[in-house]
Amino acid sequence: SLDSAEGLQFQNGSHFYIALAPKEEDSLKHTLFHEFSHLIDNRVLTKTGAYDNWNDLNPQDFAYSLDLNADMTPYKALLTGPDRVFIDNYAMTFPAEDRARIFECACTPGNEEDFASPILQAKLQRICTGIRQAFDLEDVPERFLWEQYLTLTQ
């Protein structure tokens, strides 16, 4: 709900907006990257096929809850261990939130352990590929901030 949201983004015609209302100053960076990711997501989805078959990166028996209040307890094992699939419960609500939480963590320091998981690494790879394709960055040799934890080759 808007009462508990720390940020939101939307597009009005050719204008893009991000509104931030973090509860703590420390969460400002995370909230900014998260909402920025949603804007990026829209472009990747309209300009590329990078997110086609996104659900194939998840276990076969998993389905996004599509509900912010859903009980995700049955999937708790997907949040830990070497084959971790999701950053947190919120990432299990919608594919866009999964990608936003991954992008947010990929852009902030201290998250190496999250991306040691082959599944999260594959998701990050897909996100990075999508961004490069959508913004015509495929031939740019530099690594971008969100690629700092990428271990797979481009």
PLM regions and their residue ranges:
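Active-site-flanking segments in enzyme catalytic domains
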Residues: 2-154
